[in-house]
Amino acid sequence: MAEKKGSSSEKTLYCSFCGKSQHEVKKLIAGPSVFICDECIDLCNEIIRDELPSTEGARDSRGDLPTPSEIKANLDNYVIGQEIAKRTLAVAVYNHYKRLRHKDKAGKDEVELAKSNILLIGPTGSGKTLLAQTLARMLDVPFVMADATTLTEAGYVGEDVENIVQKLLQSCNYEVERAQRGIVYIDEIDKISRKSDNPSITRDVSGEGVQQALLKLIEGTMASVPPQGGRKHPNQDFLQIDTTNILFICGGAFAGLEKVIENRTEASGIGFGAAVKSKKQRSLTEVFTEIEPEDLIKFGLIPELVGRMPVVTALAELSEDALVQILTEPKNALVKQYSKLLAMEGVELEIRPAALKAIARKALARKTGARGLRSILEQSLIGTMFDLPNTSNVEKVVVDESTIEENKAPLLVYREAAKKA
């Protein structure tokens, strides 16, 4: 190490990086035929410190991968019931991200693992969208939800399939590396089924054509996306996104699919000795457990698309008890949400067990699943929530069965009455 001060006979040493002499700096550290001063060392440390957060962030985004049981436990906090669907999803998602890690480390000669996209089948309001949203939030990966009914073939009015990738990029602030490991949920996939088995002279721009366009995206392709969401024009640079590692989850109600399955599984009989079983004896949930790829093809999905979604899971119809649980148990349960809303007015909300069952029965009658719960509860409380801000002495709002069944106003408990009691 060369000190700052030296005799005049000694040769003056200079920093190999900034060129300052040993007399201009505090310390000059010697290496094999090179020197570095203390100022350059400080500058190097600053550069390293600035780069560390982004490196740590990238490491965290691929950090410890939760196990299938941990993924399912997290789904249990938000989604009631649907045990088979949650287990299937947990394993599929775990294997997908495990595959990506293997791909990063694997050599050229190792076994290449194929991607397993997921198809969720279930009636409306059974939790398909919520499952996908909860998964993405837990894994901290970019997530986008697309509606298949708005998609058309490229060149026609409407959204083309590459808009899905553009939305995914927007959701992660145009970080290409993160977007390529994201999750895409395509809802209403059953609405783009082929209109019939017979080819038509008219072009089906929102049916089979969209399925063909989705096929390449789901399988894995290089999608060209305009930077920062601009319109496409010939003289601009495009962002190239590889969709090979994006996990696609498709969902749909597939109304009428149960008839296709029943026609395949139930043998028709004729004559006095034939065993005739009523189709009404089995629930929709039981029928969907016997689903085969050929049923989806008969329904109107093209065989290539069905083949790209090897993980097929059916969600059960929600029972009355399950709907009551949905009202009260999840982290974001509706009863908790409305209790918080009224608590902001200094009022307590009590919904009696009989009222909860009445709400569940009403939702079942509407055939909208869990999606109908909010509108029923909102309808019963709308008048009370309108009057509460102008009323100062209400302590509690009580919703009983008559409030739901007979559209009566909720009971109001006033503070004076509460004190006397």
Swiss-Prot record:
The keyword Oxidoreductase does not apply. Zn(2+) binds at C15, C18, C37, C40. GO terms for biological process: cell division; proteolysis involved in protein catabolic process. Keywords: ATP-binding, Chaperone, Metal-binding, Nucleotide-binding, Zinc. InterPro entries: AAA+_ATPase, ATP-dep_Clp_protease_ClpX, ATPase_AAA_core, Clp_ATPase_C, Clp_protease_ATP-bd_su_ClpX, ClpX_bact, P-loop_NTPase, Znf_CppX_C4. GO terms for molecular function: ATP binding; ATP hydrolysis activity; ATP-dependent protein folding chaperone; protein dimerization activity; unfolded protein binding; zinc ion binding. HAMAP family: ClpX. ATP-dependent specificity component of the Clp protease. It directs the protease to specific substrates. Can perform chaperone functions in the absence of ClpP. Component of the ClpX-ClpP complex. Forms a hexameric ring that, in the presence of ATP, binds to fourteen ClpP subunits assembled into a disk-like structure with a central cavity, resembling the structure of eukaryotic proteasomes. This is ATP-dependent Clp protease ATP-binding subunit ClpX. It comes from Paracidovorax citrulli (strain AAC00-1) (Acidovorax citrulli).
